[in-house]
């Protein structure tokens, strides 16, 4: 990928994130972490960086607009997504990547789509962006994070299992609903409920 294209994407993403500097720093952290993981695990570093850079491009869209746009663009909305519309930023972000940011690579768009819940049998790029979102350096310290950061460079599947487990626990402890796909991800990567 050409540096001019990457710089243009960075500028567009910064604008899309409503000048939320913390969100932008998180986004850069995910992009850089994705590229590092790609280098370690033998994936395409440019694709990983772009997917990481665009993973939250629909995050600042108000929830009612997320729902309206998903309907308008023919993107299916599950019951849990209606109840927790923030989950739609992944699906809508993949759509934006393709139609606003002109990303033609389906693998990049799929990595954006699945970065929140994960899914069973993810591609390597999907795994990379999913776990990079969890471990990037700007994340506040949460129980088990340092262990996951150590494991991910040796065993990305184990890191996915542990991060999914932590996410499920966090959502349960806070009385939030859990997307069934998060549970399927956890179980596929070795978790036992």
Protein language model regions, located:
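A diffuse structural propensity rather than consistent per-protein peaks
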Residues: 2, 78, 124, 175-182
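Short, Lys/Arg-rich amphipathic segments at extreme N-termini
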Residues: 2-21, 31-35, 183-189
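Intrinsically disordered, low-complexity regions enriched in small/polar residues
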Residues: 7, 57, 88, 103, ...
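Generic alpha-helical secondary structure signal
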Residues: 9, 28, 99-100, 174, ...
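Divalent metal-dependent catalytic cores for phosphoryl transfer on phosphate-bearing substrates
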Residues: 11-18, 26, 39-162
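Residue-level detector of solvent-exposed, low-hydrophobicity positions
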Residues: 31-33, 62, 99, 141, ...
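Charged phosphate-binding loop/patch that engages nucleotide di/tri-phosphates or the phosphate backbone
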Residues: 166-193
């Amino acid at each position: 990928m050409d540096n001019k294209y990457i710089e243009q994407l960075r500028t567009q993403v910064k604008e899309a994130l409503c000048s939320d500097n913390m969100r932008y720093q998180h986004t850069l952290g995910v992009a850089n972490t994705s590229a590092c993981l790609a280098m370690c695990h033998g994936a395409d570093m440019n694709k990983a960086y772009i997917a990481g850079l665009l993973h939250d491009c629909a995050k600042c869209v108000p929830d009612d607009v997320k729902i309206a746009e998903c309907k308008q663009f023919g993107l299916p909305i599950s019951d849990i997504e209606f109840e927790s519309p923030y989950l739609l930023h992944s699906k809508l972000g993949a759509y934006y990547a393709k139609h606003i940011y002109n990303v033609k690579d389906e693998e990049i768009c799929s990595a954006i789509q699945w970065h929140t819940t994960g899914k069973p049998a993810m591609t390597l790029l999907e795994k990379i962006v999913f776990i990079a979102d969890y471990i990037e350096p700007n994340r506040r310290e949460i129980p088990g994070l340092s262990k996951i950061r150590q494991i991910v460079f040796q065993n990305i599947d184990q890191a996915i299992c542990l991060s999914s487990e932590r996410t499920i626990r966090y959502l349960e402890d806070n009385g939030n609903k859990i997307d069934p796909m998060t549970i399927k991800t956890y179980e596929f990567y070795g978790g036992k409920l």
